[in-house]
């Protein structure tokens, strides 16, 4: 008989929390009891889990003593306060915030790339889910690096407002609507107007001119894939509700051509490749909403530098970029460690 587990989803009313519940139901995760948890502000609300309706539990009074796995999807401040309480009750935590990603005692996992490091989870009973851009990047870059070592990567990201939570989506919607009725709607969540606009500003600016988002992406790539290649990142917020896109320029240590890259990625887990066989042979963010794969298109040789390839990555940032990746981690846990 299949063992079943008690699961808690913290931040269940948020974008990633709701998607986590959806994916747990879709993939028939073996669940005994499941708890939807949020702040007191969400008490009285309900969320869906497959065909079931779950009532929100208060995080401030929740007891983790009988929870096997908790998915934390509610922001770094919540993780900082409540994850120690969960792990003290021997609950395994999969944290989707940035809080533990730099901790050397906490594995940072993309299942298609570095599952071997998952065994280190029991040092703190915490597993970190990577940044929503890092996950699709690693899914695409790791199989290439396994074949021919990467020397340098230049990354430009185009990140949807859902990466900033429901408040980000609301601001894009409200500003767009306001423009059509000639009503002023000043930025609240974002530093500048997001409707009909974009800006290279995600996170705070560091003294070196890079943003915290750009620094996180570079660091997490090196933690997962190693420090043998250099990375340069520019992160851009775009007026799209769901779906991230990434323009990537990859310099390799040896000779490689676009056809080689396409063949390698066609055999890789979690990737759908699109051949350059017509003028619409690329995937845009709106086309990946609700999809689990990482889509790679516009694979081509860099005409300015040898051994270098350009490609375009798109991914649903709420699914593979966040919720799906964490559920895949949990599946590996129950299959091999619990």
Swiss-Prot record:
Q: Name one GO biological process term.
A: 'de novo' L-methionine biosynthetic process
- What is the E.C. number? 1.2.1.11
List the catalysed reactions: L-aspartate 4-semialdehyde + phosphate + NADP(+) = 4-phospho-L-aspartate + NADPH + H(+)
Tell me the keywords, alphabetical order: Amino-acid biosynthesis, Diaminopimelate biosynthesis, Lysine biosynthesis, Methionine biosynthesis, NADP, Oxidoreductase, Threonine biosynthesis
First-tier enzyme category under EC? oxidoreductase
**Role this protein plays:** Catalyzes the NADPH-dependent formation of L-aspartate-semialdehyde (L-ASA) by the reductive dephosphorylation of L-aspartyl-4-phosphate.
Q: How does it assemble?
A: Homodimer.
What HAMAP family does this protein's entry cite?
ASADH
The protein's name is: Aspartate-semialdehyde dehydrogenase
Organism in which the protein naturally occurs = Rickettsia typhi (strain ATCC VR-144 / Wilmington)
């Amino acid at each position: 008989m299949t063992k079943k587990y008690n699961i808690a989803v913290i931040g269940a009313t948020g974008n990633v929390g709701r998607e986590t519940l959806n994916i747990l139901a879709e993939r028939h995760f073996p669940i005994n009891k499941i708890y939807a948890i949020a702040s007191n502000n969400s008490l009285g609300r309900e969320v869906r889990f497959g065909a079931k309706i779950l009532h929100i539990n208060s995080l401030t009074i929740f007891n983790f003593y009988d929870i096997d796995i908790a998915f934390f999807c509610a922001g770094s401040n919540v993780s900082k306060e409540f994850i120690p309480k969960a792990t003290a009750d021997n609950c395994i935590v999969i944290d989707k915030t940035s809080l533990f990603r730099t901790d050397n005692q906490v594995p940072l996992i993309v299942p298609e790339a570095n599952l071997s490091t998952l065994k280190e989870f029991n040092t703190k009973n915490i597993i970190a889910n990577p940044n929503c851009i890092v996950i699709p990047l690693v899914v695409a870059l790791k199989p290439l690096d396994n074949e021919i070592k990467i020397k340098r990567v230049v990354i430009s990201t185009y990140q949807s407002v859902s990466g900033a939570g429901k408040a980000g989506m609301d601001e894009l919607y409200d500003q767009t609507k306001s423009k059509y009725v000639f009503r002023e709607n000043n930025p609240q969540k974002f530093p500048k107007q997001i409707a009909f606009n974009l800006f290279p500003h995600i996170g705070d600016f560091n003294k070196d001119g890079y943003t915290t988002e750009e620094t996180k992406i570079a660091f997490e790539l090196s933690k997962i894939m190693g420090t043998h290649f250099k990375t340069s990142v520019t992160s851009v917020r775009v007026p799209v509700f769901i779906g991230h896109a990434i323009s990537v320029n990859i310099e390799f240590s040896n000779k490689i051509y676009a056809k080689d890259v396409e063949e390698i990625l066609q055999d890789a887990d979690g990737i759908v490749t699109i051949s350059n066989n017509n003028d619409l042979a690329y995937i845009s963010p709106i086309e990946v909403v609700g999809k689990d794969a990482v889509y790679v298109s516009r694979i081509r040789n860099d005409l300015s530098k040898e051994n270098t390839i350009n490609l375009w990555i798109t991914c649903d940032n709420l699914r593979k970029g966040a919720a799906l990746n964490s559920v895949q981690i949990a599946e590996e846990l129950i299959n091999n460690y619990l």
